[in-house]
Each structure stands twice: as structure tokens, then as C-alpha cells.
Amino acid sequence: MQISDTGRSHTPDFHAVLAREDWHNQTITHLNRLPAHPVFASWRDELAARDNLPSSRRRQLDGSGSSLTPAARLPSMRVVTQDLPDCRGTPVPSNWQMEGYDAPIYTNVRYPIDTTPPRVPEDNPTGCYSLHFTVEDTWRENGQTQIIFDGVNSAFHLWCNGVWVGYSQDSRLPAAFDLSPFLRPGDNRLCVMVMRWSAGSWLEDQDMWRMSGIFRSVWLLNKPQQRLCDVQLTPALDALYRDGTLQVQATIEATEAALAGLSVGVSLWRGEEQFAAGRQPLGTPTVDERGHYAERVDFSLAVATPAHWSAETPNCYRAVVTLWRGDELLEAEAWDIGFRRIEIADGLLRLNGKPLLIRGVNRHEHHHLRGQVVTEADMVQDILLMKQNNFNAVRCSHYPNAPRWYELCNRYGLYVVDEANIETHGMVPMNRLSDDPAWLPAFSARVTRMVQSNRNHPCIIIWSLGNESGGGGNHEALYHWLKRNDPSRPVQYEGGGADTTATDIICPMYARVERDQPIPAVPKWGIKKWISLPGEQRPLILCEYAHAMGNSLGNFADYWQAFREYPRLQGGFIWDWADQAIRKTFADGSVGWAYGGDFGDKPNDRQFCMNGLVFPDRTPHPSLVEAKHAQQYFQFTLLSTSPLRVRIISEYLFRPTDNEVVRWQVQAAGEPLYHGDLTLALPPEGSDEITLLDSLILPEGARAVWLTLEVTQPQATAWSEAEHRVAWQQFPLPAPLGCRRPPCLPALPDLIVSDEVWQIRAGSQCWTIDRRTGLLSRWSVGGQEQLLTPLRDQFIRAPLDNDIGVSEVERIDPNAWVERWRSAGLYDLEAHCVQCDAQRLANETLVDCRWHYLRGEEVVIVSHWRMHFTADGTLRLAVDGERAETLPPLPRVGLHFQVADQQAPVSWLGLGPHENYPDRRSSACFARWEQPLAAMTTPYIFPTENGLRCDTQALDWGRWHISGHFHFSVQPWSTRQLMETDHWHKMQAEDGVWITLDGLHMGVGGDDSWTPSVLPQWLLSQTRWQYEVSLRSL
């Protein structure tokens, strides 16, 4: 780029700037903003650039030395030159809603303002930031000093020392301005006037909190008079994936006279070892009849057998690009690069020749205390958690992330889909702006600047044109621009149907494994069917799937079975990473996590912002364990039981197993019988068949026999501690046949009869059944009462988010499970005891009770309990029942009762240790588990059914001992309180602890959260049932 020697033109005054109303104009995406470029540091030493040492020419302005003047509308001109009396110290970066100004708004689809594009409300909250700084004389006297804002929401005008500098919109990409003409000795003052709403807001309708302010870092950068203004680095591998080339394109900014004698050098390093270097004078070959680019240089370096970059092996090189005048170094810039080749071949997305399996997740930039301000420590925390839980990819949903994010993904190893900051979900139709050429400049700026800013990062393997904006000519045009300007990466875009001509990858959201969703104009086929449609040859990667809202992620293992079975189903990105809740002190003084509506924000979409695999503070949900297991890199097959042989397959594409040990154990009823370990030595994509035991000999009477295998990493890695578990699997083994001897019981329990109760006594045990209600109302041991409530049938659960769907008070969805249960009267059934008989049998006393559950006058459920009391203090309870066919499938069939709290851990023989449900239990293992009572609850922010453990054979908690085959939960919260409480921090302590025993429990679903997503096999569709449990209290 050539620059002239002339001075700066006259700048408009404050009133003229505001009179233009740039924030209402979608064609004005910026004024005086510098062209987008990769992150610069302007080192003046080549080795400092190589070693990424702090640059004296780049200074961060973050901190508390700034002030903010809030206004409901545009402020007076005094803010340009002075801090007003109502200004307040405000940290930069921050969202001003998190600092006590204005309210955050959470909406999913609906725009938070009236839909009148491109204009926005006249009442437009505006914050004027005042930032003070000083610069060295050398910065003012030589070169160019830039101010760089990494992120400002949503648009801003900039003044320096009272003089207008420029304007920018697009809240998620850096905006740089030349401050050189405005600087003065000593103190310099910036005024940044930030508007909450702008024309750009119509392109930023993402499912997130709507916040404002300077929320990313601010930098000062001093570049020399002749300077690098853009550098594009394209590492590539040859067709054999053996040797590499580094293609370099650099653009210089200087006067025409100064261009002569300049040259650009490139050196490539790993640590202190140099692998390649070259230098070339400015000027390109002739382009056309008008000549060549005098200010640009294009050349390549050959690199023999470079180490490849992948998420498994993130081998980074340091590319140092230098600008020279003769032998004088003017400037050095440097970036981490990686040699890898992304291509779509034979219908498969391939990296370095191998088909990828995307273990992905969508991630918003969100922090529960700081809003959308995310620090490097926060980023590292997310990356480590993702890597530890077998994720290899992340989609930047739905906007480019802070620049440091990509640098970290390069180093730690994550594949990134970089997505343009474009979403118009609330438009009707959705493509209203996408198909309007008047909006092409705004669309174009967001896509092209994203690419120009981020294209040097090896972690970015796919560009995305945005999210949920429909299909239109603007996206078509930008697809073709991308294919011309960066042919090294594929492009994806879901809008308009997920398989349009503007995407290289079929990338639907929430398509099911099998079931079609024939949505008008944009049908979603089952993913197996989609790849088999006539003429369709593209890979399919779900840009969003497995909506992880609250207690969810059912059916997740089904997706991964399909991914492994069909090569062109190459994975997907779970929605989403973290619950977007905000820590708040509520009006009553309580502190908890807030969601939509908790700040008086209207419109709002309530708790729909909480779809994470982790809580806002990054504490994992149980569903994260399910995701980790389904995505694990090792697969296991049981080949035979005697000898005990298994096959282990590595799904690593690029790394051998150089830090993996297999540990195995055979257990019977939770007791270890055999165990061992061995070192895995597998090549990439390798497998091995291993004999664990030559002969499996089990003791007589052994039951519940399981083989457990797990792969751990003995040595710490860059992203995990030593002994990190990366994979595990269980297999049931056949148990030897055996006959159980019936117990030798003492005398029969006594049966004491009165008009009101049946009373059964056996030693210190005393049970009391109310003959009117049929309920076991009292159970005393040694005169001490055990029950706080009677044992009762339980047919309901506190509705999950997936049960509620989109149903709200003002907008009922009759298809939602909660509405079907409500309209069927399930929450208001009346129990009437129609039978309560007692008799003494040969070895026990039997109480036989039957209840009719009425909906009005109609019997809709019949429940029959046979309570067998034995002299050893055992209650064996056999339950059978049936429901009317007019009732929808029930959420559960079981019983519950409340008992006094005990200071004892909960121990069980069954699936665990984490919460699991019938359609989300692949990751749970059968064993003897023990956990404190507090760990048996999952405190979902919006309270719901939680804490279940499935397929249990024995439960022991203090004096309580329960056996049979059942699912259970033990927690200090009643179903009723869970149903009636809208935030977890409002849950109140109850008198005791509730034990729930389920014979049957419906799945949780999770393909999405707005349609009934529980698969048929996990519905309680049967109209008859039976189960049996035995209870003892000692």
C-alpha cells in the first residue's frame, strides 16, 4: 500500500459527526478504520520476534484507569474533551451492564428492539469511555501509532484529544485506527462513544446475552514509517503429505519513493533451530497490461519433511517476517504456523490425507461474573477441559473470537470453525437481509475482515459464513469470494437448508439419526438418509446437535454409533459448551445464577441460555462424561470370555500410543476378582488383540460379573495431569449357574389388628399400615421412627427443560411432554385405596393393597402393592399396575418416601458414579460406588429432575438397605419443591432426605429441546408394569 506525504484532511466537528447518524446506516461499516490484518507486535529484533518476547512497540491499555459516562441517549459534546461529573471509573475491558449500568438482555431468536432495519431506537443507551495514556517521543516523531480495539459492542465513534478519528461497527473483529496525527506530548485522552444499538445489531441476533461496551482488550501499536501492513502465510503439503512449502504474501505501506530498496525476509523456526529462510525485494511479477504490485512481494520457501500440525500433534513453527532497507532491519512480525493440508476428497473432509472425525462443541464467549469479557486464563481453562473430555474441535459460535483464542488453539491443538459475525434469526423471513443487496457491504466486511485477520492460524480448518440467516445472494457472493481468496480451506454454511451451493459440507443443525423432519422449504433429513440422497457427495458434519440444556444429552451414543458406521458422517458440534448464566445478588439478598428475565429484560427467553455441558463456572454437568465416553479415541471389543480376550482399536489418526496404559479388572457384585495392566503400543489407527486371562474361573455363586477396561496416560501432558483417564468400557460376563439357598428365618412376624391399622412386629421392627389409605405410614426400629412420610407411588418427575420445550405461560405448546401430562391430569390425580388386606403366610406376613388414581371420576391408574414382611426385618415389595390408554406415556413408575437425614455416604451397586438415565448411561459403569450425599444431586440452575442412578441392585445409606433391580435417587429435595422453584439457589432445606426408587423411568431426550425428543424405545409406552424391591432399616 502506498501512502502520500500530504497531511490529514479536515475532520468534522462533534455535531457534524452525530448528524450523519452512521449507526443507522448499514452501508457505513466504518470510517477511517485501517484495513484488517493479522495481529502485529512490530518487533525491532528478529530473535525477539522468534521467541515471542514482549514487544516495546505494543502496549496494552487494559485496566481500571478508564472512566465511563453513561447516557440513555447521545451525550453532549463536552464528553469529547472532558470527563463529566457523572462519569465513573470503569475497567476496560468490561460490559457496562456488568458494571451497574443498563440491563443485560437475553433473547434467542427475537430481536431485543423493534425490527426496523437499518434504523435502531432513538433511545439508544450510549457510553462514553475516557482513556488516558502517554507515549514516548519516538512514537510521536517516527512511524505510525495505531489504536486497536479487539472488540466493542456494537458501534463506536472515536476522538483523540478532542479531534474525531473515525467510526466502526462489527462488535467481534478488531478495529484499528491511525492516531499519529492526533498525539501530543504528555497526557493523551481518548473518547470512545459506544452505542448499544447500531445497524450492525441487525446482523448480531445470536442466541446470547445482549451486552455493550469495550469488552475486549485495547492496544497501542507503534509501526515504523515503512512497515508491514499485511502478511498472508500459507503453509502447504505436497500430494504425498511429505514435503512442504510456505507461501508468503506481504504488503508494505510506504511512500512511493521509499519502496525502492526495501525487501522482505522470512525465516522458519522450531525453538532455536532454523528450518528455512529467504529474502526477496519488493514487487510482484506482472499481473496484467498495467503492470505489477510495487508494494507487495510473493514468494515461497521449500521445507523438507516438516512435522505436521493436527489437533493430536499440534506441531507449530514460528514464522518470522522481516522488512529490510538494505541490511537495516526495519521491523519484524511473527506468527505460529502449522503444516497441514485440508481438503475434501472422495466425499470426506480430510486432514493430511486422513478422514477427520469431528468431536466438536459450540462455544460462546461467556463468563458468569464478567459477561462477555473472557481472559486468557478463561480460554485456557476451556481448552484444557475440552481436550480432557476428548473434544478435538470447536465452532466459534457465532462470531470471531478474541485473537488470543486462536493462538492458544494452535498451540494446544483444537480444530476451529471460524464463523462470521452474521445472524439474522429474528427476521421474517430469515433471509430478508441475506438476499438484500443493500446489505452486501455489511455482510462482505464481516466475512472478508475475518479472513484477513485470522487466516494465518493453522487451527482454523473451516470458514463459516455465519449462522441462521437464511440463504441469499449475499452469502452466495461471499462463498465465491472465499473460495477464490482462500482455496486452502472449505466453507460451510447452514442457512437456507444446510446443503445449498454455498457450503462445501452438509452442515445441518439438530438433524436426527433416523427420523426425517420435513420442514417446509428447508427439510432436515435423517443424517443416514441425507448422505445417500441422489447426487449428494459431500461430507456431513452437524454444525449443532445434542442440545445439552439442563438434564439432557439422551440418545447421544446413537449419533456416535452412526458416525463410526458411516464414513461420510464425520461428527458434529454439540450445542453448547457452557451455561450462559450470570452471577447476581437478587432483591431478597440471595446470590445465585440469573437467566433471561432476571434483570427485568424484555423480551427474554428465560432459561434457554443454559444449554451447556458445564455450569457457568465450568463445573461439569454429568452429560460431559457421556460426551467424553462417546467421543473417546479407543474402541473395545470383547472377543471371548475364556480365554478372556479383547480387541483395542486406536482412533488417533496421527499419533501412536506413546503414553497409554490399559488397566483392566473383573468384578463380581462390585468385588474385584482379577486385575492387571499393560502398556499400549499402537500405531495411528492401529489395533491389537490382547489376552487378559488364559482361563476365566469364577467362584461359585458369583453374580453381576463385569469386565472393566480403561486407558490412562501415566505421564502428564500439555493439557492433562498424570494418570488422566482417556477411555473406558465395560462388558458383562456370564456368571456361573448356581442355586441360592432360601434363608432360614425365625418365627413369623406378629400381625396386630385394629380398626384403623395393621401392625406387624418382628423383633425390634414395627411396621404400621393405615387400613383406610393403605399406606405404610410408620416404620420404627427399636422405638425410633424411620419414616418422615409414608411410602407412596410416584408417577411424575420435576419437568426437564426437554419436557417443557418451548411451552411458556403465555405460549402453550400442546405437544410438550409437560403439557401432555398436565392436560391428562397427571399432576392432580387423587389416590383412593380400594383394597387393604392382611394375612399371615408360611414364612411371612402379607399386606395386599390396591389404589385407584382418579382424574375426576375416571380411574386412569391402578397400582397394586404386595408388601411381604419377614421376621428378619425385611420388607419385600412387589408392585404391579396399569394405566389407561388415554394417558400419555408416564415420566416414571416408582415410589418415594422421606426419611431422617444421616451423616453417612451413599453406597450402591449399580451404574455410576455420576448421574445417569436410561438413554444417557453409556458412560456409567456397573460397580460398587460410594459418594457423599451432596454428590447425589445435580444442582441444575433451573431446578428439574436430577440425580438418578440406573440399573441398581443394592443401595445402602446409613441404616437403610435396599435391594432388587431399580433406579434410584437420594437427595434432600422433594419432587414438589423441584417443580415449584425456578432457580436452584432458592431451594430450601427440608426436614429430611427423599429416597426415590423407580422400576421404570422415561429417557431425558436431547436431540433438541423444543420438540419431544425422547426416542420411542425410551418412552414408557407400555400400559402394564411390575417391579420388586426389598427394604431393610437397621
Curated annotation (Swiss-Prot):
Required co-factors: Mg(2+); Na(+)
Cellular component terms per the entry's GO annotation: beta-galactosidase complex
Family to which the UniProt record says this protein belongs: Belongs to the glycosyl hydrolase 2 family.
Binding residues annotated for Na(+), in chain numbering: D207, F608, N611
Swiss-Prot/TrEMBL GO biological process terms: lactose catabolic process
Entry-linked PANTHER family: BETA-GALACTOSIDASE
Binding annotation for substrate: N108, D207, E468, E544, Y545, A546, H547, N611, W1010
EC number(s) reported in the record: 3.2.1.23
Gene3D superfamilies: 2.70.98.10, Galactose-binding domain-like, Glycosidases, Immunoglobulins
Family annotation (PROSITE patterns): GLYCOSYL_HYDROL_F2_1, GLYCOSYL_HYDROL_F2_2
SMART domains to which the protein is assigned, alphabetical: Bgal_small_N
Catalytic activity: Hydrolysis of terminal non-reducing beta-D-galactose residues in beta-D-galactosides
Protein name per its UniProtKB record: Beta-galactosidase
Residues that hold Mg(2+) 2 according to the record: N604
GO molecular function, one term: beta-galactosidase activity
Cofactor note: Binds 2 magnesium ions per monomer.
Top EC group: hydrolase
Entry keyword set: Glycosidase, Hydrolase, Magnesium, Metal-binding, Sodium
Binding of Mg(2+) 1, residues: E423, H425, E468
Gene: lacZ
Lineage, highest ranks first: Bacteria, Pseudomonadati, Pseudomonadota, Gammaproteobacteria, Enterobacterales
Site label Transition state stabilizer, positions: H364, H398
Active site: E468 (proton donor), E544 (nucleophile)
InterPro entries per UniProt: B-gal_small/dom_5, Bact_Beta-galactosidase, Beta-gal/glucu_dom_sf, Gal_mutarotase_sf_dom, Galactose-bd-like_sf, GH-type_carb-bd, Glyco_hydro_2, Glyco_hydro_2_AS
Subunit description: Homotetramer.
